[in-house]
Amino acid sequence: PRPAAPSPLPQPREARCPRPGAPAHTRASGTARPPAASLGVVSDGRDSPEEVPVGPPDGATAAGIGSASAASAGGTDAAGTAGDGDHDTRFFGQPWALAHVFGVEMWERFSFYGMQGILLIYLYYSATQGGLGMDQTVAAGIVGAYGGAVYLSTILGAWVADRLLGSERVLFISAIIIMCGHLALSLLPGFVGVGVGLILVAVGSGGLKANATSVVGTLYSAEDPRRDAGFSLFYLGINLGAFLGPLLTGLLQTQLGFHWGFGLAAVGMALGLIQYSFGRKQLPAKSREVPKPLPANRRLPVIGIGVLGLVTIVILVLTGVIRPDNLAVVVIAVSAVSALVYFVVILTSRRLSPTERSRVWGFVPLFLTSVAFWSLYQQQFTVLTIYSDKKLDRSIFGWEMPVSWVQSINPVFIIILSGVFAAIWTKLGRRQPSTPVKFSMAAIIMGAAFLLFLPFSGGGANSTPLLAIVGILFVFTVAELLLSPVGLSVTTKLAPDAFHTQMVALFFLSIAMGTSIAGWCTQFFVVDDEVPYFLILGFIAIAVGVVLWLLTKPVLALMKGVR
């Protein structure tokens, strides 16, 4: 069923949209399972074990929704006939077509995290250092707004796939757009390159993030026992790209300059696109289907709305309403207003049963906690980058490692800890903590991670040991694994049947808001007096977690059987 009014988002199918992104999971049920095997369907087993990510932030959040088709796609060959994929074991025992999606996703994550690892310092480094000399606060705000825009674009990418082009075509087009964005950053001078490049990468990343996992789901029939391992292999590619990207682009940036680093990101995306182009015809016909085609008589109005939106944005930029220094605030406002509209539309709908309406109210405190969590977590790309540049002792046996290398720590911990969390949830079964408790624990631990900066505050340049940052990022990862995949899972369980996709959009809007706030908060960070910053934000996060913990019983009562 669909809402009475035309929905701006695709209606739910068993496999839509990917966390940002946590914004890559295994189920805590013994064997690894694709995240969306349970995410696309609101089943009777609403308190089933939660998902545990095996990917970087985006893999743990934004990549989670889309592959629900794994449970229903029914593996098909290129001609659309079922069953051939069940006998194809050429890629580590998996269908050969998986290699093509594995490759394009790995290289996309390589380019995405590689570019993001050097973006902030490129913006605020002086011209003599190869940067643009931008104010540090403005630069961090741009990075935060860009990250938020990626998650907003994920919603758009899912809609285009569901209503216009199908997942595979959107994936392919998005990869081209991403490559063009990295080329713009590497070739176009100054702020022109930044503006064009970041817009293209944000739009392309949202489209690819929303559909790659869904395409993987079409490679397997519902009964194929290889599906779980196939998704685990796919998410290994995500982590591999996220790990290698900052290492190699950062190394090239320190040796040859920023534009060489951006150029390497473009080369990586080009390699992924080339290998995918050769193999995309081998993908199942199911991957190219348009689940809910937009009626022909509605396409022109939709195009008109899109053009009007673009013209409005251009006018706002030209008139100075949207500026680099308030970009993060703009994305925060857009995300907040969108979320408010979604909540109002859903909660006032007559199509909701009393139980469904209660569950939506139960989602509200989880939504707010998610915003608070991502506001701190995503600062590893803003404040932590500045801290690593100014305060971290990056000397390794007399050689100074690039700033961006710090971004490669988190993917390693996710690979290691995801298996640990899966084992814990499997061992506990139904005795594991409820979702509100996990959310509160995530917020408290995230706040504690900020407090861990305090013993090293007040020092000069190179005063913080590298192992200290490694330890703090370990705590970041523990907090992420408690909230990111769990949040995506519970969102689908709480979603009313008539507004399933809109609820998923709300979860992504929480990530978009949090990521943008992470950029906005940087204006309060003072390198030489960082104690108040870490102290206040740390205690705010802990307070949010404690409040939710105290509200666990009433929240669970609103959730009506969903744990």
Residue ranges and their predicted role:
Residues C17, H25-R27, A32, A37-Q94, ...:
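Intracellular loop-helix junctions on the cytosolic face of multi-pass helical membrane proteins
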Residues V143-W159, S408-F421:
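Central cavity-lining transmembrane alpha-helices of secondary-active solute carriers
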Residues T154-I177, L183:
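Conserved MFS/SLC helix-loop-helix module at the cytosolic interface between two early adjacent transmembrane helices
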Residues I176-G190, I444-A461:
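C-terminal ends and interior cores of transmembrane alpha-helices
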Residues G181, V192-L208, N462-L482:
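Hydrophobic core of transmembrane alpha-helices in multi-pass small-molecule transporters
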